[in-house]
Amino acid sequence: MKKVVKYLISLILAIIIVLFVQTFVIVGHVIPNNDMSPTLNKGDRVIVNKIKVTFNQLNNGDIITYRRGNEIYTSRIIAKPGQSMAFRQGQLYRDDRPVDASYAKNRKIKDFSLRNFKELDGDIIPPNNFVVLNDHDNNQHDSRQFGLIDKKDIIGNISLRYYPFSKWTIQFKS
């Protein structure tokens, strides 16, 4: 009987730990489309880290998952609170300076800036809001369609691709 009780206690503790980790630390996710191609492709399996969101550690270049209505999307942060941004002639400008990162240059994207966002009255991103962009230029499930992304809608940043095994990746910056 003591063994059964110990087993049940261990099982309950394991379930509590798993629930805690999935709620506050990390969660698995399957990429549902090719919006982030070629960086991430449909069917890739990734780990989403929730800690950076909780502690306000999201950075430009981070690939995040976020909710929009009932859907979950994956995009790259290109500008964060307190910054200005614009895309001109295929080049990302942040705070009026060209960004030197592979995701920011030679893009086949129509020119746009913060002035295109209806919900914004100026040229600076307000607190708790981000501008995101997909790596695949033709897929506009990002700020070009949705506008600013509120921090409360961000699930976390992608910190690891573990499948397919041949594309194992830990670092997704530029």
Curated annotation (Swiss-Prot):
SUPFAM superfamilies: LexA/Signal peptidase (SSF51306). Keywords: Cell membrane, Membrane, Transmembrane, Transmembrane helix. CDD domains: S26_SPase_I. It is a single-pass type II membrane protein. Its main location: membrane. InterPro entries: LexA/Signal_pep-like_sf, Pept_S26A_signal_pept_1, Peptidase_S26. The keyword Transmembrane helix applies. Residues 29-174 are extracellular. GO terms for cellular component: plasma membrane. One of its GO terms (molecular function) is serine-type endopeptidase activity. It is found in: Cell membrane. GO terms for biological process: signal peptide processing. Residues 1-7 are cytoplasmic. The chain crosses the membrane at residues 8-28. Catalytically inactive. Belongs to the peptidase S26 family. PANTHER family: CHLOROPLAST PROCESSING PEPTIDASE, SIGNAL PEPTIDASE I. This is Inactive signal peptidase IA. The gene is spsA.
